[in-house]
Amino acid sequence: MATLLVATAVAFVYTEKLKLTPSPILGTRVDKVFSPVCECDTDTATISLRLRRRDRLTVDVIDKDGDSVRTLIQDSPTSGGRVSLHWNGRDDSASIVPEGSYRPRVHLAAERRTIVLPNPIRVDVTPPSVELVSVSPRVFSPDGDGRAEKVVARYRVDERAGVLLYVNGERRVRKRGQQKTGRIEWFGRLDTEPMPPGVYRVSLGARDVAGNLGPRTPEKAVVIRYVALGRDRIEAAAGAPFAVLVLSDAAKVEWRLGKGTGMARPGTLRLRAPLQRGRYTLTVTANGFSARAAVVVREPRP
């Protein structure tokens, strides 16, 4: 009985001494989450710590049951100071560990201490899923006049992730933040220059905090249109009136036909054909972008 009491007292004194002794480890920095399969900047976890003094260091990674899955270094002499290690999410047999939470365990031989760091590392290999809820407007014009300058895509993601917008299969926009719902905008420009008129295919993707890149959404078509005409060939008698539809979101457009010029609002443009028969070009311009139609003028019927 006396022996047991002595042993208990010794253990108590040792425990109290450990409480009063400064930790041999400080300045711990451990990545919180990563994906060993993402093939990206976050496909490894960094475990960084600072030792107060030289020692022989063993660091392994343990699972939720406290079992070691990977030994990173073993009985390695260190001179103290900063130590940084990297874990690629694989166990000692080079297999990727199951998803879940892991923690670094540090053994200091000279100190005769083993410390489990209170820094969980989450292994996540499941990619996020993003839904493209809507795209509007479907026709826009990035010409700088403040009217219909951009496309807005609204989305939902099944986990917190950064959303990416692709145009014709190429990534054009990366949304800051990691909201599960929101909107992402495309201004129809390459660098600072507006892109040519035409049909463009828009889709979304998402990359989660761990780095997993999810599949892209089905594509939706949007149209960049600065100005367009309802017809590309117009036939009219000399001096006769004719009309052509002008499509543009500009406040006004400028037209030119032969020696005649003028300003008009988009919509139905009503003009008169030149008095001389021949082939002319009708040019309609909005904010520096033009559309053209051939105007064939024939002799008036007798």
Predicted regions and their residues:
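Glycine-centered tight-turn motifs at strand-turn-strand junctions
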Residues: S68-V97, E170-G198, G260-G278
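Extracellular Ig-like/FN3 beta-sandwich strand-entry sites
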Residues: R54, R82, E99-R103, R160, ...
